[in-house]
């Protein structure tokens, strides 16, 4: 089924830091799912119920009224071990929870990666297909005039976000044909 699915999302935040983390996660997940072409995010102005749903059962009838087929509820809080994310995914029309997740993010620099991972979980749970949002792309960046080309090995997230882009070589040597090793932890390339 390639029809778009309405997704409501509610995030509870404790303070300005967790609000920032929650907003970042929300934006990443919403962008990923919307860009897949299979989802749309229901306009937040239409929400009837918007309090913390992580600890409560949603009023499914309210969400049906605004055409949300699925609901993602999350709570972001700060702990001494990092940023805690609790998430629940609901099937609104069948009035049931279909996924539950709790994890601690030890480093705020991993927020984007966690957003992509949660997107994969939501995508897979709803569509039955493996998500692709936590994908890294390795490539050769080329700059300069044709006769003085500088080639550098680079890596980025699948969405190309500026925060995920990183050069891995300095451009002093030519790089060709980058590939991930089978363990996905190393990159091989010809120099």
Where are these regions (language model features)?
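Structural motif
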Residues: 82-84, 146-154
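Short loop/turn segments that connect beta-strands within beta-propeller blades
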Residues: 93, 157-161
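Amphipathic beta-strand/beta-sheet edge segments enriched in Tyr/Trp
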Residues: 54-121
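Residue position within the beta-strands of beta-propeller blades
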Residues: 73, 137-141, 186-190
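Single conserved hydrophobic/aromatic residue that forms the stacking wall/gate
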Residues: 1-11
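Conserved beta-propeller blade repeats
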Residues: 111, 121, 125, 165, ...
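Short, solvent-exposed, polar/charged sequence segments at loop or secondary-structure edges
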Residues: 16-28, 34-83
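Residue-level detector of Asp-centered blade-edge/turn motifs that repeat once per structural unit
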Residues: 131-133, 182-183
């Amino acid at each position: 089924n390639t029809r778009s699915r309405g997704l409501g999302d509610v995030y509870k935040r404790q303070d300005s830091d967790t609000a920032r983390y929650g907003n970042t996660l929300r934006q990443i997940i919403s962008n990923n799912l919307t860009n897949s072409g299979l989802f749309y995010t229901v306009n937040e102005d239409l929400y009837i119920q918007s309090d913390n749903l992580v600890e409560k059962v949603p009023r499914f009838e309210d969400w049906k009224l605004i055409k949300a087929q699925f609901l993602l509820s999350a709570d972001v809080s700060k702990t001494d071990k990092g940023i805690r994310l609790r998430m629940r995914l609901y099937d609104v029309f069948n009035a049931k929870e279909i996924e539950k997740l709790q994890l601690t993010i030890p480093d705020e620099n991993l927020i984007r990666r966690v957003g992509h991972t949660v997107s994969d979980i939501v995508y897979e749970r709803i569509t039955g297909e493996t998500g692709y949002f936590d994908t890294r792309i390795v490539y050769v960046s080329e700059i300069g005039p044709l006769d003085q080309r500088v080639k550098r090995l680079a890596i980025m997230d699948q969405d190309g976000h500026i925060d995920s882009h990183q050069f891995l070589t300095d451009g002093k040597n030519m790089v060709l044909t980058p590939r991930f090793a089978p363990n996905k932890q190393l990159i091989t390339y010809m120099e």
